[in-house]
A protein has these predicted regions:
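Histidine-acidic residue clusters that define the catalytic metal-binding segment
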Residues: 273-282
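Conserved catalytic or metal-liganding residues and their short signature motifs at active sites
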Residues: 1-241, 283-288, 292-300, 308-333
Length: 333
C-alpha cells in the first residue's frame, strides 16, 4: 500500500515536471522562432537599450517576459547589444537581428562626390546627408582649413571626389578629413612619378592645373591631350585663356553665358588677363585629371575648341584655331 502511494506520488511528480518542462520548452521555442515585424527598415538602438525590451518591440508573435529572460540567459552573447543604426530585414529571425545588434555592424550610408564639383557643392551634399552630424556650419573656411591641416586656408580642390561610407557616429568634418587625406596621399604619390621638366613648382600648382583639366574635359581619352595644351602654353609664357577659370572668377554673376566683359574682368581667376595659373584650384579634380596634369601627352598643340559631344578639335597655330572656331562654334565655312 505504501509502495503504491509512493509510486503514485513519484509518477505525479514526474508528470508535473514533464508538463512543466514541456511548457517551458514551448515558451522557449516561442521566443526562439520570433521574427521581425514590419518592413525592412533602418532601426536605431539607443544607448542603454535592453535586449528584452527590443524583443518585445520588434518580435512578431506572443511571448512572456519570464520566457524572454530565460531565453536570454541561454544566449548571453545577445545581451551586450551596441547602440547604433542598423538595417533590419522584414521577416528575419529576431535572433539574427539581436546578433546584428551585438556585433555592432551598423548600416553604412554613403556619399558620392563627382569630379569637377566645387567645395560649395560638397557642403550642400553634406548638409542634406542623413544621420550625419553637422559641424561645418559653425566654422569659417579658414577655421576648417586649420582643423584639417590645410596650410593656405583655401579648401577648393583639396578633397578627392570618391564615394565615402559612414555610420551614424560620423560628422561632416570626418568625411572631409578622409577626403583631404586621400587627396593629399594621391597627389603626393603622383608628384613623385611625374614627368620631368613640367612647369609646376609644387604639387599644389599641379592640383590647380588638374582642376582646370577636369573642367575642360568632356571625353576621358582627351585628358592628357588637353593637359599638353596648357603645359605647352605655360612653357611658352602664354596666357591659359580657359573659360572655366573665368566662370569661377565671376562667381554668382555667371548665368550660363560668358560675356565680353567677363573676359576682361580683372580678378585672380581670369586667365585671359592674368599670367600663369590662378591662385587656387577651381574644382575638385579626380585622379585621372591629376595623372594627366603630371603626365601630359607630348604634343605641339596650343589651342582647342569644342566640336560637339564633349570632344575637341586641337590646333597648333592661331590661324588653324580660328578656322576651327568658325567651323564648330560660329558654324561658318
Amino acid at each position: 500500500m505504501k509502495f503504491n502511494r509512493l509510486y503514485t506520488l513519484l509518477a505525479g511528480a514526474a508528470l508535473t515536471v514533464a508538463v512543466a518542462g514541456g511548457y517551458v520548452y514551448y515558451k522557449w521555442q516561442q521566443v526562439e522562432t520570433l521574427t521581425n515585424k514590419g518592413p525592412t527598415r533602418l532601426f536605431t538602438v539607443e544607448k542603454g537599450a535592453h535586449a528584452a525590451r527590443l524583443i518585445a518591440e520588434l518580435g512578431e508573435g506572443e511571448t512572456s517576459p519570464w520566457a524572454v529572460r530565460l531565453w536570454l540567459r541561454g544566449h548571453p552573447e545577445l545581451v551586450a547589444i551596441k547602440s547604433g543604426t542598423y538595417e533590419i530585414k522584414e521577416g528575419a529571425p529576431l535572433k539574427e537581428t539581436l546578433s546584428l545588434f551585438a556585433s555592432g555592424k551598423e548600416f553604412h550610408f554613403s556619399l558620392t562626390f563627382v569630379e569637377g564639383s566645387r567645395f560649395e557643392d560638397w557642403l550642400k551634399q553634406l548638409s542634406s546627408a542623413p544621420y550625419l552630424e553637422r559641424l561645418t556650419v559653425e566654422q569659417s573656411e579658414t577655421e576648417l582649413a586649420q582643423e584639417l591641416g590645410i596650410d593656405n586656408g583655401k579648401l577648393e580642390g583639396w578633397f578627392l571626389p570618391e564615394t565615402y561610407a559612414y555610420t551614424t557616429h560620423a560628422s561632416d568634418i570626418s568625411i572631409l578629413r578622409r577626403a583631404y587625406q586621400d587627396m593629399k596621399a594621391f597627389l603626393d604619390a603622383s608628384w613623385e612619378k611625374r614627368q620631368a621638366n613640367l612647369p609646376y613648382k609644387t604639387p599644389y600648382e599641379a592640383l590647380i592645373m588638374a582642376s582646370i583639366i577636369e573642367k575642360e574635359t568632356g571625353q576621358p581619352d582627351e585628358r592628357a591631350q588637353i593637359a599638353s595644351v596648357f603645359v605647352n602654353r605655360l612653357r611658352l609664357g602664354m596666357k591659359l585663356q580657359t573659360d572655366p577659370t573665368v566662370i569661377y572668377g565671376v562667381k554668382d554673376r555667371y548665368d550660363g553665358n560668358i560675356r565680353r566683359s567677363d573676359l576682361t574682368d580683372v580678378n585672380p581667376y581670369n586667365t585671359y588677363v592674368i599670367d600663369g595659373l590662378p591662385p587656387t584650384p577651381i574644382a575638385m579634380p579626380g585622379k585621372a585629371s591629376i595623372e594627366a596634369a603630371l603626365n601630359p601627352k607630348s604634343t605641339d598643340y596650343l589651342y582647342f575648341v569644342a566640336k560637339g559631344g564633349g570632344a575637341h578639335y586641337f590646333s597648333r597655330t592661331l590661324d588653324e584655331h580660328n578656322r576651327a572656331v568658325r567651323e564648330f562654334i560660329l558654324k561658318k565655312p
